[in-house]
Amino acid sequence: KEFGFDGVVVSDWGAVKHRAKSLKAGIDLAMPYSADYGKQLADWYEKGLIDEGDLDRSVGRLRELAEKYRSAVSRRRVTMTEEQKHELAVRAAEESAVLLKNDDDILPVCKDKKIAVIGGFAENPEFQGGGSSRVNAKVSQSLCDCLKNLGFNVDFALGYMIRYNILTPFGIRYAVETAAKNDCAVVCVGNTWLTEKEETDRFSLKLNSAAEDLILDVAQVNPNVIVVIYAGSAVDVSAFEGKVKAILYMGYCGEGANEAAADLISGRVSPCGKLAETFPKSLEDTATADRRGNGYSERYPEGVLVGYKYYEYSGIAPAYPFGYGLSYTCLLYTSPSPRDRTR
């Protein structure tokens, strides 16, 4: 009533504990379906705790939504081909990726350089989180193939296996040998959907130890390491940030992830993405550092100081602030002078 909203109110999945009480509170559609919901409504109706008016109002809103949907579907015209949709997915990934670090302008990589691509995510990228967000992509290419298509000489090494959705060390020696004989090494790491999903919180901002150890091992034999991160939220990169030349944060950017990564690494596209959240230096710098939850519930005593506002208010310097993102463009300002615009 306060917001003037007259549409359908839908619950989050599994959020309704009592269907009849939720109906009185304004929930029209409780998800997912449960046969117990009907029993609760019938029981409360027989007891006089809800009436026909409560039911009719809710059903009326649902019918109105169904009519609007049917009308919208009849007017919908899909004009994009599958190829055009994929091109859009690649462009969205290119414009969403964030370049966090680029020392000595290691990126973009020249085509005469030999590249070692290391990590299972290079072959099978994790481009979405777990839970209701997961979809089956129609197209997914390996980073090696994408770089080869752009004319690069590429060697691949696994470096780790993804077993039960956990990164496990595998073929470290071969990965290090491969990195040593190439001009630069692109190490692809990140979090699997088991770590980044709905219903639970992460217990750490760090990457899996197998990923961090792989980066450090490769950095010992090759001074030109480029780390590509596939993850759904902030990552603590302090363990390897000082050992590598570049960090490219791809996030979870859909089916075009590796094509976009190749375009960014090659310089075919210049990075333009900006962070949508602050990346702290460590978990201890966050507002939740002193109140580790149980993974399923959380309190927010910081009030309105959620996210980047907390760091500004507390004076804690983050690793990468909200809105941060590098590009391949260099700007130089010299001798600025004010102009009188009153004339």
Stretches with model-predicted labels:
Residues 1-6, 10-19, 37-50, 87-335, ...:
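C-terminal non-catalytic regions of proteins with extracellular/luminal or membrane-system context
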Residues 54-58, 73-78, 108-111, 278:
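Short coil/turn segments at secondary-structure boundaries
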